[in-house]
């Protein structure tokens, strides 16, 4: 649940908050501005930089920290918590595992993960399945993290072969003997949906 909220905030608030030139930013939520009432600073658009700004530098700092939030691990599990092109090496019990992730996410729901353990090892790769893939489940307090996605909603394969997975706390878990060069492919359909800001 918290990773879903972090992802929604990152894409819809933080990254959208600064313009492409980095010299204007939102102090109000433009999704809720109605053009009639003046919110916060009375500006429904991006404001110019001013003398003592604290929010814009914090957004810049957050963007630099994102790679540290993309992966987590335990002694025999690797977790992909956020998706995007990246590389990391994870120390698991008995081996180190290099991971290379390629994806155009969030513009495309296809994620390709190359798994390179130093030696063949048995461990779990856990890939987060965002709750937004099910519009009835989006960031609800009572969402069901272990709900098995419908096959039409999420596709998961290893080395080109469709694979079974178990849902645990919002993650698709694949436990197997991994060899250097194994490739996991995740496809989450991403139809455009209207989400109201409340």
What are these regions (language model features)?
Residues 2, 13-14, 61, 67, ...:
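Functionally constrained cores in energy, signaling, and assembly domains
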Residues 1-139, 167:
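Aromatic (Trp/Tyr) and acidic
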Residues 155-183, 189-198:
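A surface-exposed beta-strand-loop module
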Residues 137-149, 188-198:
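Glycine/proline-rich low-complexity spacer/linker segments in large multi-domain proteins
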Residues 88-90, 153-156:
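Short polybasic amphipathic segments
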Residues 121-123, 150, 180:
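Short loop/turn segments at connectors of secondary-structure elements within structured domains
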Residues 44, 146-152, 159-160:
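Intrinsically disordered, low-complexity coil segments
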């Amino acid at each position: 649940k918290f990773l879903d909220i972090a992802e929604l905030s990152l894409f819809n608030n933080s990254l959208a908050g600064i313009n492409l030139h980095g010299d204007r930013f939102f102090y109000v939520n433009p999704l809720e501005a109605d053009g009639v009432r003046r919110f916060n600073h009375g500006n429904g658009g991006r404001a110019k930089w001013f003398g003592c700004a604290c929010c814009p530098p914090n957004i810049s700092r957050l963007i630099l920290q994102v790679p540290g939030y993309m992966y987590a691990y335990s002694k025999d599990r690797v977790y992909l918590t956020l998706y995007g092109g990246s590389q990391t090496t994870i120390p698991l019990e008995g081996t180190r595992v290099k991971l290379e992730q390629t994806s155009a996410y969030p513009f495309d729901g296809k994620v390709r993960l190359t798994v390179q353990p130093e030696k063949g090892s048995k461990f779990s790769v856990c890939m987060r399945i965002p709750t937004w893939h099910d519009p009835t489940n989006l960031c609800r307090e009572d969402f069901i993290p272990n709900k098995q996605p419908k096959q039409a909603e999420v596709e998961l394969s290893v080395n080109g072969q469709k694979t079974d997975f178990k849902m645990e706390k919002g993650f698709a878990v694949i436990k197997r003997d991994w060899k250097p060069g194994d490739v996991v492919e995740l496809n989450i359909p991403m139809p455009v949906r209207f989400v109201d800001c409340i």
